[in-house]
Structures are given as structure tokens and as C-alpha cells.
């Protein structure tokens, strides 16, 4: 593996799952066939790794490996990690969908909230489980469902608002069966949410934001300058068009109007398995990146909104179309905006970077900052308030944690 201006690299190695079975043909994925993954619950066996920083600068990782969720921490920006803690003891049928991964968030006092999904049957009906740690990650409460409803739930997103309340959103199919029983068609799932004011121990009753969302794409979650949740998601618009939408909450319990991010006109009766990424800058600008294969445009795109998500700029193409750009991530960090995504040149997968220092008005030229010759997880971005980092799990080269450096 080659890292341009490599800042940090762990000595840990990993095995990442090969191409996942049963994915829709529409999915853009760079996971290629290889030998079976190892079955241990160690980071080197992880298929998905999610980072989060605590208020003291501690880096936390949550990962899937061996049918279990595990957590470890680093006090030296990823150079070394603590002994891992298994959040789940028995092996579970964890949601291995391309956009599924454990979610971890840390509050101002160091409390940890964690959520993940499992499959409950062979029809891929899911269940969102939640847990928390109140002792600095040394132990976690037994996982339990986020809602008592037994309909399928997947693709959760969680985060702490500035006051320390956990906000959780997920895709939920509870309204599908009643609609069909009444002779009505019901496409996709619904966007639901709940909140926890005790650090993730208990959650409020689930409430709906919108029906007929795409059922298989991750959510983008951020908080605006007022501490209100903002959720980006792939919606199902009239005619079966699966384009992206966004909703801003007036408070933790009051979702606002759903607005369209872009008119890509991707009409597809299948699962794209490719959700958006959302960040909100200190200026209050919404920044969204996404993938589409629509009639109006194809590939990765970026747009911004300066009116609270009501309207967005014309989509800006991202990446080289002939290299299948995929899995975009964007973050508003201390040095401005950073955006990463994956490309595949026929031999290797690279992580590419663009940065902006004027709130998205202009962007640097794309440059590759990492590559690998085998399967890999999505590239993720995380910030400790002083530095932005790339977090990337690879099969051949292990887990890597790399500082995003300024343009040369």
C-alpha cells in the first residue's frame, strides 16, 4: 500500500470480507473475490471499522468481526490501541450490507453510545440494537432493541447533540404491512427517529419522519448551529425515482419539511446500497455528497445549501467516471472541508481527496492519498477538533489512520 504523505499508520492488519452476496446490480462496489474472512473478533479480522473521537482526544473504534461487535481506544492518534472489549458475546448475524456498520458516539463526559443492526431472518429483516458504556469503554450494557416494534429496522445513525441527548434515526418497515393489507402499494421503508436523555440507556418511542424512503442506503446525520438534527437520505419520489432528500428538525422531536437535494432521476426498482454523506460547516452551510446512476447524471456529486437545506446548488461532479468513483465522505474540519471517495483503476483501489478552504466555493484538484490491491471498507473521515483524519480498513494492508494534510 502507498500513502501520499502518510502521517500515521498502525501496525495492525485486517481481513475484510470479499464481495458480499446478494447485492443489487446497481451497487457500485470495489469488493472483489478473495478467501473467506477469519472468524476471530479481532481488528485484523474486521469487515467494517467506525471511528469517533472523545472530548479528551481519545480515538475510539467500533468494528465487526467474527459475528461480534468490539471496541478499542487509542491515546496516540491510532499508533497503538487498548485491548479490545467485546460489546456482544455470542456470535450474531450482523447486518453485512454494504452500507451497514456499527455506529459509535462519545459525549462530553466520555459516555459512549453504540448502535448496530442484525439480521433476524433469511429475508434480511433487520433489528437495530443499542448499548452504552458509562465506565470509559471498559464494559457495555447488554444490547437491546431500540424499539419494541418487530418490523424490519436497518441503517441506523446516532449522534450526541450539544446538550448530551442521543439522537437516533433509522429505516423502518412497520408501515409496509398495514398499507398492503389495505390494498395500498408501499415502496421502500420509512425514516424513523428516537432520542435518549440518559446517554443511551433508554430511548423515547419511535416517531416517523417520512414514508417511502429507500430501504437499503445509509443515512447522513449532522447537527446544525442550533444543535438540531439534520438527516440526509435516499428518498423514493414519484415514479420510483430514488434521489436524495434532507430534513432539518425544529427541535429533537419535530422534523421539518423534506426537501430534495438533487433531481438525478434515478428510477430503479432495486437497492442502490449507496447512501449520502452530510456535514454542516461553522458558517451553517449544508454540504452533501452522494452517488447516482440517474437519467440526469451518473457518478459522484457534491452540492451545498446556504438556506438550511431548502435549496441546493447545481451538483458538482466528483472523481473520474471511468474509474467507478464510490463511497463519498465529507467533513467540516478545523482546516476547512475535506472530501474523500474510492476509485478502482482495474488493479487497485485508491482513496482520493479534495479540500476546500472557502466553505465549498472552490475545491483543490483531486489527489490519491492511499491505495490497496484487495478489498477495503469505505473511507471515513473524523476530526478531533484540531486535525482531520482518514480512517480506512483494508484486507491486504490492515487498518490505517492517516492525518489529512494541507495542500502541498
Residues covered by each model-derived region:
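Bacterial N-terminal signal peptides
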Residues: 9-22
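Extracellular, repeat-based ectodomains that mediate carbohydrate processing or recognition
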Residues: 27-408
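N-terminal secretory signal peptides that target proteins for export/translocation
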Residues: 1-6
Amino acid at each position: 500500500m502507498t500513502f501520499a504523505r502518510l502521517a500515521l499508520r498502525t501496525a495492525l492488519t485486517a481481513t475484510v470480507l470479499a464481495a458480499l452476496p446478494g447485492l443489487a446490480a446497481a451497487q457500485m462496489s470495489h469488493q472483489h473475490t478473495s478467501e473467506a474472512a477469519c472468524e476471530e473478533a479481532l481488528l485484523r479480522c474486521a469487515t467494517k471499522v467506525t471511528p469517533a473521537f472523545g472530548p479528551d482526544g481519545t480515538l475510539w473504534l467500533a468494528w465487526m468481526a467474527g459475528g461480534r461487535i468490539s471496541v478499542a481506544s487509542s491515546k496516540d492518534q491510532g499508533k497503538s490501541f487498548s485491548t479490545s472489549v467485546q460489546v456482544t458475546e455470542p456470535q450474531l448475524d450482523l447486518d453485512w450490507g454494504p452500507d451497514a456498520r456499527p455506529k459509535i458516539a462519545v459525549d462530553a463526559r466520555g459516555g459512549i453510545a453504540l448502535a448496530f443492526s442484525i439480521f433476524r431472518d433469511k429475508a434480511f429483516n433487520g433489528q437495530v440494537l443499542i448499548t452504552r458504556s458509562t465506565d470509559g469503554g471498559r464494559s457495555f450494557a447488554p444490547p437491546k432493541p431500540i424499539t419494541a416494534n418487530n418490523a424490519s429496522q436497518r441503517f441506523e445513525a446516532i449522534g450526541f447533540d450539544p446538550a448530551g441527548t442521543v439522537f437516533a434515526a433509522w429505516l423502518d418497515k412497520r408501515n409496509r404491512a398495514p398499507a398492503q393489507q389495505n390494498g395500498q402499494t408501499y415502496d421502500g421503508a420509512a425514516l424513523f427517529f428516537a432520542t435518549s436523555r440518559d446517554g443511551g440507556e433508554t430511548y423515547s418511542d419511535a416517531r416517523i419522519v417520512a414514508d417511502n424512503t429507500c430501504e437499503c442506503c445509509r443515512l447522513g446525520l449532522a447537527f446544525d448551529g442550533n444543535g438540531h438534527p439534520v438527516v440526509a437520505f435516499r428518498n423514493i419520489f414519484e415514479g420510483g425515482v430514488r434521489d436524495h432528500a434532507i430534513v432539518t428538525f425544529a427541535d429533537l422531536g419535530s422534523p421539518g419539511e423534506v426537501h430534495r437535494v438533487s433531481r438525478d432521476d434515478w428510477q430503479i426498482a432495486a437497492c442502490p446500497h449507496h447512501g449520502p454523506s452530510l456535514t454542516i460547516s461553522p458558517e451553517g452551510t449544508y454540504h452533501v455528497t452522494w452517488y447516482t446512476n440517474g437519467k440526469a447524471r451518473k457518478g459522484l456529486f457534491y452540492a451545498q445549501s446556504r438556506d438550511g437545506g431548502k435549496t441546493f446548488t447545481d451538483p458538482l461532479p466528483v472523481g473520474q467516471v471511468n474509474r467507478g468513483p464510490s463511497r463519498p465522505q465529507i467533513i467540516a474540519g478545523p482546516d476547512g472541508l475535506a472530501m474523500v471517495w474510492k476509485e478502482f483503476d482495474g488493479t487497485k483501489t485508491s482513496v482520493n481527496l479534495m479540500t476546500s478552504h472557502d466553505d465549498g466555493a472552490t475545491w483543490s484538484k483531486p489527489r490519491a492519498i492511499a491505495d490497496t490491491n484487495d478489498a477495503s471498507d469505505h473511507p471515513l473521515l473524523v476530526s478531533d477538533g484540531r486535525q482531520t483524519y482518514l480512517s480506512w480498513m483494508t484486507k491486504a494492508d490492515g487498518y490505517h489512520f492517516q492525518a489529512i494534510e494541507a495542500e502541498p
